[in-house]
């Protein structure tokens, strides 16, 4: 990451990761080489499933690194669970128990956000993000599910939400 970039900007970190894996994006968030539109989701907050604690977005942009005598700095493995805020993610209400407690207990206390649009910056409240500035003045509406690509994404998220925290290493 360049010194001029803010380490808390997870989008800049994501762009670097995409370049490193050889996947370039064109305007509109589409992957070059793939002509299908990929629905975008905004990261609300992240929970470390090992400890059951919420992580700040700054921690996800640059995870801690431990020295290794053979390879230099090595990023230790960390299981994370991405939580989306809003009523448009009903399949994410099903959770599995994890090391430090149950995510269902934390989720039961979460208020629903005003819409499914979340700010990319760290939210004012740790549980509910601000709206994106462009969305102010316009009502936020959920788009109807028409695309098989979106259905695939939803199915993948269902599978991910039911197994990530349940894995044991």
Curated annotation (Swiss-Prot):
Q: Which GO terms describe its biological process?
A: positive regulation of intracellular estrogen receptor signaling pathway
Top-level taxon of the source organism: Eukaryota
Which Pfam families does the record match to this protein? C1ORF64 (PF15547)
Q: Which InterPro entries match?
A: C1ORF64
Q: What GO molecular function terms would the record report?
A: nuclear estrogen receptor binding
Q: What induces it?
A: Up-regulated in breast cancers.
Record-level GO cellular component terms:
cytoplasm; nucleus
Q: In which tissues is it expressed?
A: Expressed in breast tumors with a higher expression level in estrogen receptor-positive cancers.
What does the function comment of this entry state? May regulate the transcriptional function of androgen and estrogen receptors.
Q: How does it assemble?
A: Interacts with 14-3-3 proteins.
Name the PANTHER family for this protein.
Answer: STEROID RECEPTOR-ASSOCIATED AND REGULATED PROTEIN
Full protein name = Steroid receptor-associated and regulated protein
Source organism of the structure: Homo sapiens (Human)
């Amino acid at each position: 990451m360049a010194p001029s970039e803010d380490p808390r900007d997870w989008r800049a970190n994501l762009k670097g990761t995409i370049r490193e894996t050889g996947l370039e994006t064109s305007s509109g968030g589409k992957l070059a080489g793939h002509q299908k539109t990929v629905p975008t989701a905004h990261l609300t907050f992240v929970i470390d499933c090992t400890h059951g604690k919420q992580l700040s977005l700054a921690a996800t942009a640059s995870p801690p690194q431990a020295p290794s005598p053979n390879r230099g700095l090595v990023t230790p493995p960390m299981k994370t669970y991405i939580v989306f805020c809003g009523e448009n993610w009903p399949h994410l209400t099903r959770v599995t128990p994890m090391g430090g407690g149950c995510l269902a207990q934390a989720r039961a206390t979460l208020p629903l956000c005003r819409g499914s649009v979340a700010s990319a910056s760290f939210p004012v409240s740790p549980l509910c993000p601000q709206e994106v500035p462009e969305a102010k003045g316009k009502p936020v509406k959920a788009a109807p599910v028409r695309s098989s690509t979106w259905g695939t994404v939803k199915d993948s998220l269902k599978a991910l939400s039911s197994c990530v925290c349940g894995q044991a290493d």
